[in-house]
């Protein structure tokens, strides 16, 4: 054990600890210690290797690391490979940007093989960057052998899963509407669509009813470009629709509009007058045929038999009639399936109209809005704009379209019920994340489109014969090599595209062009990280995962994709427990964005305050499942907390080193806390109390950690450090550290501080691994494990927990706060003693606590006596105050006289009479409780303050003896400050002189009693106290200072003895 002189410097401390971990290979050695423990299989949700980590990524990994460190200290053998998502559009778009590409054509021209290699290089480079950033956060995962979705063995895990889907009849080729990015020219998942406000046209259009002159169905849309694909109009059977004769500019039209919306629509169309001809139920309109207003521009529209259909989702807004284009909307597509409508989709992969769109061919669809509107001519009833939330590609930010295309699907709807049953078997943190949020999402989920029309991803392992149409799904690379007779060195595009499988018909099977949705990559992580299906041993022993945790958006992402793939492959969930955490936002609850200028990076926090502060802060700020609203002031609060921890740790070391203190060890030189257990009954109250408190802390944190209430644990730890340890126990025990002679009291103090710090650093280790390691490294005994992270999680020692003592100490702390307030009111500093402190209470608990801990109360109050009085204290007088709102109405003209009588009365006697009899006679008038209130009239020099269930009274009146002690304490404080300025060791003796410019004060502190007290406290081998008229003393000292001590001028000089 060494003395620590340096202040808390987190960056220097953490760099040193991480260097030690690296040099000593500490992580691997900790794993070795736990290798025989019960396995705990954790699957790391893989971040995309697209750049540097952000605050949300850091928070995510910190949560994971904290929980895994906790379980490791609980004896578990943690299986914890880091993982990285290294395929997909996130990587492709980054590489395209680097190469200056804007379209798939650019990639084709560049060469798929060359582009793939660029993607591979980018992904691996950024994986290494991110791994280093995670290491800097103190994250202990297996970064030397992470699972990588680009590896051949990982790709096989995905191939095997889709082969299982084929075997179970859960894989199909379908023509459906999907989210489509026209820039990336691929389908994208619902979870990959980002929404923000966008302004679009808002138009009302008249569709002419077949066979009825000047009669129209009025629809509304914000996507005019979808009108060339219109095939139907939907109405609600629950609504009433009006057939209206509307007049404008001398002509009349017959319009069909939802009855409640007639006036708003006609007003928008600037009609002057109207008459309702009839009202019908929506179901009566079903089957009505109409013509396309664009039949002249889009030839195919003339071939479609347009009609009205019923739909429950139609809302009573705009016109109450909805334009249906099954090729451009999911709900429309479902109606089309139900009604047998054509899914007409004259739009290509790049978002341009095809030749089937007639006059609009080759135009980008969203650019065509104005032309479509112009082509409507007189069929346009009204045109406005609307600002609404619209979907965009998550990677390139292009506005998406909905497009009917041929894709590969997993039939998630057929396994929906098994998935819901599996959700109920999983332990969710918090519970509602599974039972409500995730359950509802899965309940409403659609079949999963697993195909993408891109390059850098896991190739879908489906080979299809061009002649007979037969298809086969390959499960492993070995199977592919066997079936094809060709070697497959890299299962990526374009290499795997060249592999041909002979078909039984005599033809050739070629691989379909698509790659997997990147979400399917990570969906198989729980078995891919175990090497399955190549290797079975680890899978059979460990799968499914014991625990995973990711952000709340992963209910639509990774939580779901894993559940879907695993239910397809194994019929069960791939995880046993899931923690869902929130989003990292700014202080105002907004998403962090460069455009807002509100981004805070982990590096910013780490560089200013250190890794442990960042770690502790993000765990302390809120419950894991709530959003983190980052706040710099709170970060500073945590920095102060760890700084206080460091100072508490430093505080006893000089005394321990000076006294050659060796903590009592157990068998093999291992510290086991046995000294405290063996001597607890002989130890002072404050020692027994802090020992009880740290064990109570261990008990509560154990329960909270089981439920992953990380915020409760960190807040309890912070409160213990600040309130229990620093602001209370250290203040109580400090004088015992200064004792010159060896004594049981000093030994108890040393052993207690050591015991508490050893327990505390073990509790802190998962949260602040660096400072815990640093403190432990200096405190550990020869037989102790080499790292704090090799220790077992501290269990509460129930024999050392004293609930009654903890309750009593809370009373004393409340008393201490009240004394401080009363002294402040009386302008008497705590260093100055007072004659008497009285506590008036009706609480037996307060009375018992202050009597049992009276010595402690006396010391804290710096009072000659501390008395507890039940009832009333006889020195308290009462001042009577009239209540005029009661006196006026009852006494009328006599009111002023009654008022004067009450004000002049003996308030104490009047209060006693009313309390005794319910009334009192005063000058011939009957005074009741309603007529008067009473205020305390404290004796001169007595000041009061409330505490819980009591009132504290402090008499600050000074006597010569009290004044002498007060001045002596002031002198001691000044000399101690001067010792610090001279940087003296705690055991250095000094010589000192105190020259006082006041005869009376000089004579008070020159008394032998106080000279000895001062000399003893400041370790003065020689001390002179004398009267001075302001002249400088003739001696010279190493340090001389003038002080104003409560208005008295003093000159103090000190030097190290012997110099």
UniProtKB/Swiss-Prot annotation:
Q: Which reaction does it catalyse?
A: tRNA(Ile) + L-isoleucine + ATP = L-isoleucyl-tRNA(Ile) + AMP + diphosphate
What Gene Ontology terms describe what this protein does at the molecular function level?
aminoacyl-tRNA deacylase activity; ATP binding; isoleucine-tRNA ligase activity; tRNA binding; zinc ion binding
Which principal EC class is assigned to this enzyme?
ligase
Q: Which InterPro entries match?
A: aa-tRNA-synth_I_CS (IPR001412), aa-tRNA-synth_Ia (IPR002300), Anticodon_Ile_ABEc (IPR033709), Ile-tRNA-ligase (IPR002301), Ile-tRNA-ligase_type2 (IPR023586), M/V/L/I-tRNA-synth_anticd-bd (IPR013155), Rossmann-like_a/b/a_fold (IPR014729), tRNAsynth_Ia_anticodon-bd (IPR009080)
Task: Cite the entry's keywords alphabetically.
Answer: Aminoacyl-tRNA synthetase, ATP-binding, Cytoplasm, Ligase, Metal-binding, Nucleotide-binding, Protein biosynthesis, Zinc
**Where in the cell is the protein located?**
Cytoplasm
Q: What is its EC number?
A: 6.1.1.5
Q: Where is the motif ('HIGH' region)?
A: 47-57
Name its GO BP terms in alphabetical order.
isoleucyl-tRNA aminoacylation
Motif window: 'KMSKS' region: 591-595
> What's the chief localization of this chain?
cytoplasm
What are the record's GO terms for cellular component?
cytoplasm
What SUPFAM superfamilies does this protein map onto? Anticodon-binding domain of a subclass of class I aminoacyl-tRNA synthetases, Nucleotidylyl transferase, ValRS/IleRS/LeuRS editing domain
* Residues at which ATP binds: 594
| Cofactor or coenzyme needed | Zn(2+)
Family named by the database record: Belongs to the class-I aminoacyl-tRNA synthetase family. IleS type 2 subfamily.
> Subunit structure, per the record?
Monomer.
Domain observations: IleRS has two distinct active sites: one for aminoacylation and one for editing. The misactivated valine is translocated from the active site to the editing site, which sterically excludes the correctly activated isoleucine. The single editing site contains two valyl binding pockets, one specific for each substrate (Val-AMP or Val-tRNA(Ile)).
Describe its function.
Answer: Catalyzes the attachment of isoleucine to tRNA(Ile). As IleRS can inadvertently accommodate and process structurally similar amino acids such as valine, to avoid such errors it has two additional distinct tRNA(Ile)-dependent editing activities. One activity is designated as 'pretransfer' editing and involves the hydrolysis of activated Val-AMP. The other activity is designated 'posttransfer' editing and involves deacylation of mischarged Val-tRNA(Ile).
* Protein name stated in the entry: Isoleucine--tRNA ligase
Q: Which organism is it from?
A: Methanoculleus marisnigri (strain ATCC 35101 / DSM 1498 / JR1)
């Amino acid at each position: 054990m060494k003395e620590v002189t340096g202040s808390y410097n987190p960056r220097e401390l953490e760099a040193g600890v991480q260097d030690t971990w690296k040099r000593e290979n500490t992580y691997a050695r900790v794993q070795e210690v736990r290798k025989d423990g019960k396995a705990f299989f954790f699957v790391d949700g893989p971040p995309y290797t697209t750049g540097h980590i952000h605050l949300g990524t850091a928070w995510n990994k910190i949560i994971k690391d904290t929980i895994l460190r906790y379980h490791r200290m609980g004896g578990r053998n943690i299986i914890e490979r880091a993982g990285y998502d290294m395929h997909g559009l996130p990587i492709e778009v980054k590489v395209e940007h680097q190469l200056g590409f804007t379209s798939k054509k650019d990639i084709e021209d560049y060469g798929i093989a060359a582009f793939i290699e660029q993607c591979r290089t980018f992904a691996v480079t950024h994986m290494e960057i991110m791994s280093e950033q995670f290491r800097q956060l103190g994250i202990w995962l297996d970064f030397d052998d992470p699972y990588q979705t680009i590896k051949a063995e990982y790709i096989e895990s995905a191939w095997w899963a889709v082969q299982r889907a084929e075997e179970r009849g859960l894989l199909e080729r379908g023509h459906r509407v999907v989210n489509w990015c026209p820039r990336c020219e691929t389908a994208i998942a619902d979870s990959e669509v980002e929404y923000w406000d966008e302004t679009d046209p808002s138009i009302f259009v008249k569709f002419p009813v077949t066979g009825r002159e000047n009669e129209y169905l009025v629809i509304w849309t914000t996507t005019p470009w979808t009108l060339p694909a219109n095939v139907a109009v939907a109405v609600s059977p629950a609504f009433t629709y009006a057939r209206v004769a509307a007049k404008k500019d001398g002509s009349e039209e017959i319009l069909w509009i939802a009855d409640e919306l007639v006036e708003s629509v006609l007003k928008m169309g600037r009609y002057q007058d109207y008459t309702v001809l009839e009202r019908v139920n929506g179901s009566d309109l079903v089957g009505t045929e109409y013509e396309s207003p664009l039949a002249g521009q889009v030839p195919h529209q003339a071939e479609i038999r347009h009609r009205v259909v019923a739909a429950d989702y139609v809302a009573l807004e705009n016109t109450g009639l909805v334009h249906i284009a099954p090729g451009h909307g999911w709900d429309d597509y479902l109606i089309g399936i139900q009604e047998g409508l054509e899914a007409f989709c004259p739009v290509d992969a790049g978002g341009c109209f095809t030749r089937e769109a007639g006059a609009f061919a080759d135009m980008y669809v969203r650019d065509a809005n104005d032309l479509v509107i112009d082509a409507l001519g007189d069929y346009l009833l009204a045109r406005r704009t609307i600002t609404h939330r619209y979907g965009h590609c998550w990677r390139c930010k292009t506005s998406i379209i909905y497009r009917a295309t041929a894709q590969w699907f997993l039939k998630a709807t057929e396994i929906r019920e098994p998935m819901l049953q599996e959700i109920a078997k999983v332990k969710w943190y918090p519970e509602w994340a599974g039972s409500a949020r995730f359950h509802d999402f899965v309940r409403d989920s659609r079949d999963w489109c697993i195909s993408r029309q891109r390059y850098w991803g896991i190739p879908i392992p489906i080979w299809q014969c061009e002649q007979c149409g037969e298809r086969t799904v390959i499960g492993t690379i070995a199977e592919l090599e066997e079936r094809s007779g060709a070697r497959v060195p890299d299962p990526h595009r374009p290499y795997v595209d060249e592999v041909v499988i002979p078909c039984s018909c005599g033809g050739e099977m070629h691989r379909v062009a698509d790659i997997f949705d990147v979400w399917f990559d990570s969906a198989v992580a729980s078995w891919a990280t175990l090497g399955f299906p190549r290797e079975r041993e680890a899978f059979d022993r460990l799968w499914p995962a014991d625990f995973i945790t990711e952000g709340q958006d992963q209910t639509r992402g990774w939580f779901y994709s894993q559940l879907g793939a695993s239910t397809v492959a194994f019929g069960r969930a791939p995880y046993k427990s899931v923690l869902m955490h929130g989003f990292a936002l700014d202080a105002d609850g907004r998403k962090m964005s460069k455009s807002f200028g509100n981004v805070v990076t982990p590096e910013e926090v780490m560089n200013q305050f250190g890794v442990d502060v960042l770690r502790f802060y993000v765990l302390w700020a809120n419950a894991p499942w709530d959003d983190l609203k980052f706040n710099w002031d709170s970060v500073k609060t945590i920095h102060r907390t760890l700084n206080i921890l460091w100072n508490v740790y430093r505080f006893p070391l000089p005394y321990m080193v000076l006294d050659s203190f060796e903590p009592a060890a157990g068998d093999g030189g291992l510290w086991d806390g046995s000294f405290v257990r063996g001597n607890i009954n002989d130890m002072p109250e404050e020692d027994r109390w802090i020992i009880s408190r740290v064990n109570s802390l261990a008990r509560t944190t154990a329960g909270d950690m089981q439920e992953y209430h990380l915020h409760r644990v960190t807040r309890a730890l912070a409160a213990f450090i600040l309130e229990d340890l620093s602001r209370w126990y250290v203040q109580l025990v400090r004088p015992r550290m200064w004792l010159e002679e060896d004594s049981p009291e000093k030994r108890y103090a040393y052993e207690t501080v050591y015991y508490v710090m050893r327990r505390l650093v073990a509790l802190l280790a998962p949260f602040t691994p660096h400072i815990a390691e640093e403190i432990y490294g200096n405190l550990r005994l020869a037989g102790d494990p080499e790292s704090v992270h090799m220790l077992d999680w501290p269990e509460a020692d129930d024999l050392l927990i004293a609930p009654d003592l903890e309750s009593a100490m809370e009373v004393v702390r409340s008393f201490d706060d009240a004394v401080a307030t009363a002294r402040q009111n009386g302008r008497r500093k705590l260093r100055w003693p007072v004659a008497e402190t009285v506590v008036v209470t009706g609480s037996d608990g307060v009375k018992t606590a202050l009597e049992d801990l009276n010595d402690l109360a006396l010391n804290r109050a710096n009072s000659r006596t501390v008395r507890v009085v039940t009832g009333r204290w006889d020195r308290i007088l009462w001042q009577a105050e009239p209540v005029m709102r009661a006196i006026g109405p009852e006494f009328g003209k006599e009111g002023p006289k009654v008022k004067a009588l009450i004000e002049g009365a003996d308030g104490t006697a009047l209060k006693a009479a009313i309390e005794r009899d319910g009334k009192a006679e005063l000058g011939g008038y009957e005074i009741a409780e309603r007529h008067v209130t009473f205020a305390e009239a404290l004796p001169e020099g007595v000041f009061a303050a409330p505490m819980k269930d009591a009132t504290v009274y402090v008499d600050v009146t000074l006597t010569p003896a009290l004044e002498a002690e007060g001045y002596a304490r002031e002198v001691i404080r000044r000399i101690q400050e001067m010792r610090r300025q001279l940087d003296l060791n705690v055991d250095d003796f000094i010589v000192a002189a105190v020259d006082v410019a006041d005869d009376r004060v000089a004579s008070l502190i020159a008394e032998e009693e106080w000279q000895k007290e001062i000399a003893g406290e400041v370790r003065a081998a020689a001390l002179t106290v004398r009267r001075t008229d302001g002249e400088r003393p003739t001696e010279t000292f190493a340090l001389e200072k003038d002080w104003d001590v409560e208005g008295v001028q003093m000159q103090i000089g000190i030097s190290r003895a012997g110099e």
